[in-house]
């Protein structure tokens, strides 16, 4: 499966080339494919905040490279560069509040910094750590793709209709994807009849990104408005809802793109299985439950305007980016460490005590 997935890879969103972070501007897809070069921590933080790059794993990877860029600038200026670098850590940490992968990656970069020995070359050490974070995410995605595909096949070996939300593919990760990685593997195994992709308002990650990724690989995909999901579950023989995650708490609650919670409620009502696919870096064992997760809200103009023109009356807008799905609505959480079925605090703790499978 690994070799087949590698051979099928066609999309990527992050490149580290000659000391520059190159990001595919996802705001312009699918009409334009524009790569932007980033040479400083401040530029990377702005790219994360402005959603040039999005998806929890991709944000974390980008932030790690941002620290490398920050260190390069601080070292060039001389003086107490380590203390000065803390400003870059703070700047990147403040770029998006909900995706825990961001903080995980920054903490890993800080820990590597603290472990440096006399004679180490700081920039080379930090660059190697950022590349390791990037590479390990790709490996995690390959492992999760296999595990998730096996869950699908275990339930039903014939081609199935699957519903997904937002974008969880190569564009959102270091490669292949989380939920879309599972879907890719299932397609290669002949387990996919059709993918139904929610358009995912207001940024339309489903219609702009997910549909684009799947169509590029020849995977049958139909786009639907978000509010059609329950109707699809009732009428189109959906067997799985498969989504990613931006943060998973110690009890198995999941924060993900707004609209995920209602998908889980509808899935339970219709007897549709619900799978969450995310690397273990998304799991925050310091938070007891989803009640503790900070939920980002974005500018209401994202709802009130189209193309910069106001289309709604002079009203306020409520624009949360994420919601929290309780663990008791989730059939399985798939990570590179293994699978947790019917997640709860005890099972999540057992998962996190395991070694990685890749």
UniProtKB/Swiss-Prot annotation:
Q: What pathway, per the record?
A: Amino-acid biosynthesis; L-methionine biosynthesis via salvage pathway; L-methionine from S-methyl-5-thio-alpha-D-ribose 1-phosphate: step 1/6
Q: Which reaction does it catalyse?
A: 5-(methylsulfanyl)-alpha-D-ribose 1-phosphate = 5-(methylsulfanyl)-D-ribulose 1-phosphate
Residues annotated as binding substrate are 54-56, 96, 205, 256-257
BP term (GO), one: L-methionine salvage from methylthioadenosine
Q: Which UniProt keywords apply?
A: Amino-acid biosynthesis, Isomerase, Methionine biosynthesis
Quote the catalytic residue positions: 246 (proton donor)
Give residue numbers for the site Transition state stabilizer.
Answer: 166
Give, as one word, the top-level EC class.
Answer: isomerase
Q: What is this protein called?
A: Methylthioribose-1-phosphate isomerase
For this chain, one GO molecular function annotation is:
S-methyl-5-thioribose-1-phosphate isomerase activity
